Structures are given as structure tokens and as C-alpha cells.
């Protein structure tokens, strides 16, 4: 009997593994024709590096991007472009293949022209900032590698081009993208950008009345140097050239094969340093290059483990469902390319933006362009990139996002004290990577007596609560994976303290009492996202405060002597307000508000992300009524960009609507790479479009409430699926739905199986 049991377990394990491998290979992106331009590029990356890879007119191109490469204006600069040319050219014939090999995390390109055949492997070392290009051919070729830069001279940016930086529509004088330093050195091409002493940080500090604190404020742009070197063992310097790609002039620095060869290996090592001396940066770069080994095995293992950790593979008769499953995996690949980034993955393009005129023909700017800035962090967008990482078990990948806020904590507290004289960290929605409001959104044309802590902005005024979603994510990593979150407790506590201190401060300015007649904070003025403005007791803020406070109080990391303080604050948070449509009770966006300014539905934030309403919880009918009858919610409904309607539908168990909206969101993008969605409200590839799609698919498949785990709460019975997702309390759930029946369920630890509720036939 024991032998039979062992055989069955072994067989099941092998069967699971083989089906995962097959499903993953099926999701590989394969092109058999070359691309027309960079918009038809393929993402490749690893660690904190992203490449756009494409072959155009027989030449191989790569854009180089890396996390944290911010210039003086807070543009997230690319690190240049590589162009590979070959003689004789195997890519001048009719036989061609380019493939993204998801399982191992790299791309291959093969071509044949007459008798000559060649294959190129492009991969990034997950653990070192090094790009490898392996070129193999059946006959000797001469390879030319051209490092191309559009930053060979200073470039004045005007008009909409400044949307790529922190000045946006309100530049203060002439704004320039400063040139890079590029030269042949040490047998290769060395390139770097060194930030000048004066940056947008200094301009913003002065604008917001914080000059006296300038030397104590955290400044990530100061002394920043970033770049790299391109080398090849059989490559020598071969002079310069110049040209124009699309509308952007460039200059090139060429390396060429010393002698024709059947194999070449190009190495591009990158380095980012905070140092005032270029020599220090060069020393670090040299060390990185010396330790760069052409050994892909560790990176392959990382990608293999990444895919085995979590997946959703759909096999349905509905092609839209199949596309959703595939694009879920493709987008997760893009997220994995910034697993160890110094900065979080940007919602507006991540590491994979391309020439802007291919998105909007009027924007004939450089490849550095992205709408909504480089160093500007827009919290309502960013959150959608990071929430799905809980159910995929990618807790390590959430660290850059958490550390982003932790690094800015001191600045946010200084800002609060300077403006209002009380405690707490005030984080705004449009937040710079140094913790102050974006200067354009803050407003240059302000009444003389307008408070320095406030943004003079109809969309953003009084929107303080977006940081609380990141506080909740931190707390959830502890609940999901027993992560040690002690270092983040000051961030969570200071963010909560701001609300207590600030709304007592405002109440005392209006009158003698700090609280209302029921002993609650008066959350006025507030904001329901960017939509319901000058709100009194905004529902999104109330839901956020209640949920974060409850989670903090329950956290084992919170010192016992702190629990009474936060329990007392929880008692001061007012209740959610309601209103009626067609005699149906619905959740109101606030108790009162003055105007509607945008197209969000924060009245449903108690459903997601805050989970106050949902399957198996009191008031589900009220939340469903809000989704179905609230005229604003109906008017704002969409699947585009950051819209969350698919997530709301899934959380409410509305299978048909969840499937419709999620497949619309996750269907092929219309671009050559299926997961390059956008621009939506932001930019292409739109990462908050992909993130909200991921969340929706996950919530359709599995939800949790305390210890309970609901399977298929909004999943169509005819969508066959093999999945593996994470639940709270260090739990993984893997299984298959086949012909409407759950088979092969695997729950770890096994003790959690009793908490599973299969809803496929009960809804």
C-alpha cells in the first residue's frame, strides 16, 4: 500500500510538472517575421534590467533600461540602444524566428540566408547588472555592435516633452536633458550620465518653503551616476557613425569583430552609484565586468522557480479566456524583470517603453519619453502593479515598493511639521522620489497665503490616503508569509498618526471641539480618490483607516504597549455612509461632497482593496447594489487602464460581469507583443492595466476571508484551468478545474484543506 501511495504521489507530481512545462511553452511568444519598428519589440530582462528586443531590416536592436536611472529633471533615462549588424547577414533571408522563452527567461533569434545560419541568445543575469548577447553561426561572420545614443549633446525639452520629467507643464525656465559622456575605453564603449549639482529636487524644496531643511532632506538625485560599458573578447573599436531613428538623431560608437568568427559574445555591464567622483563609479563598473560570467544557469534556475511558484494556465473553448491566461503570464514576466530593482516598477511603462511617436504620432521625442514622468510616483496607479504579487507569492519583489515609502518617511514627516506643526507623515498622490508633491501638481500659481503643505490642485487636494494601501500590503506580507515587517512599523504608524493629528488640527481651527458628537474624527476636507472632492467623511479613507488599524492591532510585530493607542484611534473612525438608487441601498462615496472631478468609483473601495464587503460577509447585497445601481459607478464603468470594475465584480461573485470585464482587460493588446497594453490613461506598456487584469483573474479564481479560502467564487464553469496561488498563513493552493469539476487539489500545508470552500457549484 505504501508503495502504491508513493507511486501515485510521484506520478501526480510529475504530471503536474509536465503540464506546467507544456502550458508555459505554449505561452512563449514566437515571431516568424521581422519587426517594423520599436513598437513591435519584445521585452527581455532580469534582476532590475529591461530590454526591448527587435529585428528590423536584417539588423538586431536592443533598448537598454534599468531601475533608478533618474536624471537632474527626474526623467527615467534609458541607457542607450545597441544595433547589431552582420556580414554575411543571416537575417537578410526569408527564414526567421524570434522567441521569448518564458521558462528560462531569455529570448532567442535565429535566421538563415542561403547557406549561412545563425542564432542569437539575449539574456540578463538576474543577480548581476550584466546583459549577455551570444551569437553562434555555422560560418564565419563579421559582427558590428553599435552603441547608439541620442544624448550625445544637451537637448532642450519643451511643451509636452516635459511630461517625461517632474516639471511637466510648468517648467521654470529652460529645461535640458544633459548629455552623456561616451567614449571608447578599455577595449569597449563606456557610457554614463552624471547628474549636475542642481536638480529638480532643489527647485521643489524652494517652491514648497522647505529651504531651511534642505540639507537634512533625503535627495536621491544628488551625486547619481549611471551607465555602463559594452565589450566583446573578439571586438575592437571601429569608429563612429551618426544617423536618425524615426525622428531622433543619434551618434554611434562601433565595435567590430577583430577577425570573422562563428561565435561572438557581447557583454554589457551596468553600474549605478551615488558618488561625487566618476573614478569611483568606474572602479565599481570594472569590478562588475570582471565578475561577469557567461553562465546562465543561476538565472535559469531563478526563472524556473519563479514560474513554479505560481501560475494560472487556462484551456477553454473561449479564446478570450485563453488570451487572458496567456497575457497574465506574459505580464508577470515583465514584472519579474524588476524583481530586485532599487525602485519599484513604474506603472507608466515599467522598463519597456519605446519611441513615443509610435504611440502618438504628435510626440516626436526621444526614447526617454514616457507620459506622467520618471521619478514621479502616482500611488493610485502604482498600487495595482503590486497588489497581485501577494497571490503569486512574489513577496521579495514587493520590497522595492515598500522601501520607496520607507526611504521617504523622514521627508514626509519634516513636510508635515513645517506646514502644520504636528506629527505624522503626509504622503500625497503625485509623489516625487524624494517625498514631496510633484512641483507642477503642487502648483506654481498659488494664493500668497495658501498653506505650504497643500497642493493647489482640483484633482489632488486633500488626497492623503493612498499611502494606506501600501501600509496594508506590508501588513499582508506578514499575514501571508510571516515576513518580518518591524522596520516598516514606523512608516505605518506615522501614516496613521497623520490622519489623527491633522483632522484634530483642522477641527480645532474651526471650533472648540476636536471630535464630532459621537466621538469620531471629522474627516473634512477629504477626497474620494480624485473624484469626490471636498468630501466629508470619504468612504475610501474610512475603509482604509479601519482596515489598516485593525490589521496593525492584530499584527504580532506590533509591541504590546502600542495596541491600546491604535485601538483608541480605531474607535474614533466614523462609519461608512449610504445612499439609495431605485430604492436600493448603496454605499455612498462620502457623507457629503462638493463636486465630482474624475471617473473613479471609491464607493466600491470597501469591496476592493479593503475587503469590508464581499462573499460571505454582511452587507454583500448593499455592495452588489452599488455595483449595479449607482449611476456614477455605471457611468464610470470601463476595462481600460487602471479601471477596477473587473476586480469589483470578481470580489462580489458576479461571474458573468467579472469574466466579461477581465477578458476585455487581458485580451491581446493589439500590439505585436500581446501584453503591451495602453496607453489607456497613462502610457504604453501600461502596467496598471496589466496589474488590474492580474488582480481580477486571481480574484475570480480564489479569494480569502480570514482563514476561509473560496475557490472559483467568480470563475466560469467552462473555463478549464490549472492554477497555483498563495493564500494567507503560508498556504499554497494548486489544482485543476476540468469540465466543471475540481480535480487534483493540492493544499500546503495539508491542514488548510479543511478551510477550502469550492464554490463552482454553489453560487
Please identify what each model-predicted range represents.
Residues 113-119, 125-130, 139, 151, ...:
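A conserved hydrophobic secondary-structure block that centers on an alpha-helix together
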Residues 352-376, 427-486, 500-567, 743:
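The feature captures the catalytic groove of carbohydrate-active enzymes
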Residues 325-326, 376-381, 393, 461-469, ...:
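Aromatic- and histidine-enriched alpha-helix N-cap/loop-to-helix transition segments
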Residues 472-508, 565-594, 613-733, 737-738:
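Non-catalytic carbohydrate-binding regions of carbohydrate-active enzymes
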Residues 24-444, 542, 550, 560-632, ...:
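Aromatic-residue-lined binding/catalytic grooves and analogous aromatic/hydrophobic interfacial grooves
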